[in-house]
């Protein structure tokens, strides 16, 4: 057992235990800081708070007769601005937005804005570069539910010389008006938001989740919206009851999401957990998701944004996460007009999600929409409806059910045709599945270029529930169906086993090369 520091500030640290486990251990371990018991935890990745700046600490983890130690020194901090001293009350009655915003704007480089215990009623906060924002234990940022008290971001603004546009607002892959998020970063860098507190969107079916198909004023806000940002870290705190997507980094890079807890009701609409859109160099580690839509959805805009900015999402690592109750555990799409590449998912637990891996695309995403080099390794799935889904006929768009999108015949490859290649699934065990082992479907005119499965074990629940494996026209509900694979040029299966299925283990059509051993 080894212990390493993966993130450190002047007041906090996140550590990772290297012991070959996924997300958590069977037993709790004891964490000692400089010889004193700090807490007990069974988590592989955990955080420490309440540390002092520029101070050396020895951390010892004891579990089942084993010990692991590490020593580190916390970083520098210039000054702390306590929002109470700036005028915030934290009584849940006063609108504290302006007071917290004043503290953020007044905070110098390498300073800390401290939000102590209390309930702070707010609308939208805006970050600035080179600061640290701490949500202390017991601190709650309680978002106002009156949408018309939030600022509005226009979708696209024409430049003064009429030669360029400035994109600010976004909704599901298009430049559209949106309400500002609860916490916003616009072109900021070197920011850490950390602590043991809570951001509560206070969304419910009486406000933000009511009549979600109608835009009223603007589209719904995200909990945290980061646009064109660099070097941003979110560490340790809790988020719940989001109006829509919880974390939405947009055209940003150098992002770290560590040891966060994200919860929304299972029936809450469009409450994705973390949706990096046209982002690169993203680390997602130690997060717990339990929500009403995709846990993680990697995107890059619809065809207009893909053609205009040609900014794929790339170099994304997801590890040691627990994903529960969502539609998809890790989803790519469906807004992927600029493509997605180099995604690695490892050492994760998927529990009670509709799908494990979920790739959603369709004709019309464009030739820049290349989804490539996506790998899953050392994954456990429990009670997942369908472990692997690749759907090239996704119908959830205004034109998603048109003949062009849903035609099963090979159409000409043109500037509207997306591509999928190099998908890898290794060391995966999925138990108590329900609908199908997989549903992997490329386009007949642009087949998926290589799928490899190695050391994959799938078994079905005895009382398997029926469901539709993929959101495309003509797919009927089923249960305990085997590996369905269509329109793939190369399929390689090494040590792949399936038990409890009805009928054939593999149902394949239009496969150019199949190798099994």
Regions inferred by a protein language model and the residue ranges of each:
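Extracellular/periplasmic carbohydrate-active domains that bind, remodel
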Residues: 1-517
């Amino acid at each position: 057992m080894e212990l390493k520091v993966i993130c450190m500030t002047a007041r906090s640290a996140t550590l990772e235990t290297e012991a070959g486990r996924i997300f958590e251990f069977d037993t709790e371990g004891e964490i000692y800081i400089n010889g004193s018991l700090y807490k007990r935890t069974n988590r592989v990745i955990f955080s420490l708070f309440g540390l002092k700046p520029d101070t050396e600490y020895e951390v010892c983890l004891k579990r089942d007769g084993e010990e692991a130690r590490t020593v580190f020194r916390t970083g520098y901090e210039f000054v702390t601005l306590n929002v109470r001293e700036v005028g915030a009350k934290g009584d849940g009655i006063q609108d504290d937005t302006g007071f917290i915003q004043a503290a953020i704007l007044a905070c110098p480089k390498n300073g800390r804005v401290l939000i102590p215990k209390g309930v702070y009623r707010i609308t939208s906060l805006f970050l600035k570069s080179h600061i640290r924002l701490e949500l202390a234990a017991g601190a709650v940022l309680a978002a106002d539910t009156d949408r018309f008290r939030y600022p509005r971001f226009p979708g696209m603004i024409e430049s003064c010389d009429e030669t360029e546009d400035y994109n600010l607002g976004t909704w599901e892959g298009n430049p559209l008006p949106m309400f500002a998020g609860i916490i916003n970063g616009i072109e900021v860098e070197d920011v850490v938001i950390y602590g043991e507190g809570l951001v509560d969107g206070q969304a419910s079916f009486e406000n933000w989740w009511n009549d979600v198909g109608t835009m009223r004023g603007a589209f719904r806000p995200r909990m945290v919206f980061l646009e064109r940002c660099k070097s941003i870290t979110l560490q340790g705190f809790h988020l719940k009851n989001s109006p829509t997507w919880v974390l939405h980094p947009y055209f940003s890079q150098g992002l770290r999401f560590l040891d966060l807890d994200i919860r929304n009701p299972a029936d809450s609409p469009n409450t994705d957990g973390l949706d990096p859109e046209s982002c690169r160099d993203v680390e997602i580690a130690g997060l717990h998701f339990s929500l009403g839509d995709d846990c993680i959805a990697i995107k890059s805009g619809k065809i207009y944004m893909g053609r205009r900015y040609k900014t794929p999402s790339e170099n994304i690592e997801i590890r040691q996460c627990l994903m529960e109750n969502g539609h998809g555990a890790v989803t790519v799409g469906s807004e992927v007009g600029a493509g997605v590449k180099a995604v690695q998912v490892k050492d994760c637990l998927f529990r009670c999600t509709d799908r494990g891996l979920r790739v959603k695309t369709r004709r019309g995403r464009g030739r820049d929409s290349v989804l490539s080099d996506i790998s899953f390794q050392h994954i456990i799935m429990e009670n997942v409806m369908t472990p692997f889904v690749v759907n090239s006929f996704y119908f959830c768009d205004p034109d998603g059910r048109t003949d062009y999108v849903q035609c099963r015949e090979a159409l000409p490859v043109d500037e509207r045709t997306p591509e999928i290649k190099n998908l890898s699934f290794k060391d995966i065990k999925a138990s108590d599945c329900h609908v199908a082992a997989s549903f992997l479907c490329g386009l007949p005119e642009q087949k998926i270029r290589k799928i490899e499965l190695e050391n994959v074990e799938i078994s079905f629940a005895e009382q398997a529930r029926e469901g539709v494996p993929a959101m495309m026209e003509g797919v009927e509900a089923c249960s305990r169906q085997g590996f369905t694979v269509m329109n793939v040029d190369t399929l390689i299966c090494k040590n792949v086993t399936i038990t409890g299925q009805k009928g054939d283990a593999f149902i394949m059509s239009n496969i150019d090369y199949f190798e099994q051993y």
